[in-house]
Regions:
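Conserved GNAT acetyl-CoA-binding A-motif
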Residues: 86-99
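Conserved acetyl-CoA pyrophosphate-binding loop and the N-cap/start of the following alpha-helix
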Residues: 69, 73-81
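A short, internal acetyl-CoA/4′-phosphopantetheine-binding micro-motif in the GNAT/acyltransferase core
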Residues: 63-70, 98
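Short amphipathic alpha-helix that is part of the acyltransferase structural core
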Residues: 1-26
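Short loop/turn motifs at secondary-structure junctions and domain boundaries
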Residues: 27-31
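Conserved active-site tyrosine of GNAT-family acetyltransferases
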Residues: 106-107
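Conserved beta-strand in the GNAT
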Residues: 38, 43-52, 56-64, 94
Length: 107
């Protein structure tokens, strides 16, 4: 499974993004200024949006895993990849995700 950054047509991942944040308005807001990463096999498995919050802080705004892949370590793998991405550039990786029922069960 590969993780790659998506720079165009980010809204095509909206169904997965809505698993991590039920408010499409909020998704639009941070998707515009953030970076979208997708884990994909044959189809998208997980998405993650990160934003530069300044002062050396990278924040995970949205993290969602397709329900067919829950409890398989996918979310952890995405977080690990974001930590690797942040290393050497940011001093803090913080998680600022919504409180949808699916998100809360992950935490």
């Amino acid at each position: 499974m590969d993780i790659f950054e998506v720079t165009e047509k980010k809204k095509q991942y909206l169904p997965l993004l809505l698993l991590g944040d039920e408010q499409e308005e909020m998704i639009d807001r941070y998707l515009e200024r953030g970076r979208l990463f997708v884990m994909q096999s044959e189809s998208p498995i997980a998405v993650c949006v990160v934003t530069d919050e300044g002062d050396g802080v990278l924040e995970i705004k949205n993290l969602a895993v397709h329900s067919d892949f829950w409890r398989q370590g996918i979310g952890r793998a995405v977080i690990d990849e974001m930590a690797n991405h942040a290393r050497g550039v940011y001093h803090t990786l913080q998680i600022g995700i919504g409180d949808s029922p699916a998100t809360m069960s992950f935490l």
